[in-house]
Amino acid sequence: MNKTELTKLNVGYNLDWLMNLDPRGYGVCRILYDGAIKYTGKPLSLNGAEGLVKNIKKGEKVFILTGFILLPWNEAETDGIISSTVFARFVIRAFGAKPVMLVPEQCEKAIKAMSEVLGVDITYDIDNIPDNTICIVSFTKDKSKEEEQTQEILSHGLPCAVISNEAPGRNKNGYYHNAVGVNTTDIEAKYDVLGNVKAEVFIIFLSVTLAMSLVWALLKNI
């Protein structure tokens, strides 16, 4: 291991440990982290950043999945929407890529508000995404329509990356649950089916690691 590799490793671990601070004693994040780092074999921030730099290409689409709907309010939690919109701007600025945010309809208003703060434009035309623009696609909550919409979206071209950030995922029985075990299947967008795309795309699932990967990938020389 040379000096550069050692520096990457150490900074990667530092970012991981920073993001895993647990002031309230929740504990779950560290359990998940232990499993994830066994899988990657390296700091999650480093793994994510290297994947972003390697796979995201100028002018190509990057799918960003976000928007966990919460009961009883039937609204999306805010951390995923805000951080994903910031990430979309990062994709534009760092790589010149075309971010496509696939979200439940409840997210659209917040994304538009964030876009004004960030100085980016919004479009709904997935075939024509101008520079400095985020494309919004509202994804179905109807399981019987998920495959049809997935194929329609992919007919416009494959993405170079699929990023899932604070987004729900179904269990082996096809159900979605929130953090306290309540079944939320009927209210969640079914976009996690895009994680099964059979193509040579980079698929990464992020939560707090989004911040780690974003900071690291800014270096661009890794």
Regions found by a protein language model. Give the residues of each.
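An acidic, phosphate/nucleotide-engaging active-site surface
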Residues: 113-202
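A structural signal for small-residue-enriched, beta-sheet-centric alpha/beta enzyme cores
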Residues: 190-198, 203-222
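Histidine-anchored nucleotide/phosphate-binding helix
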Residues: 77-96
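Short loop/turn segments at strand-loop or loop-helix junctions that form parts
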Residues: 64-69, 164-168, 209
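Short internal beta-strands
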Residues: 98-106
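Short, glycine-rich nucleotide/cofactor-binding loops
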Residues: 37-39, 61-62, 66-83
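Short, charged/polar "capping" segments at the starts of alpha-helices
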Residues: 107-113, 214
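Positively charged, low-complexity intrinsically disordered leader regions
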Residues: 1-61
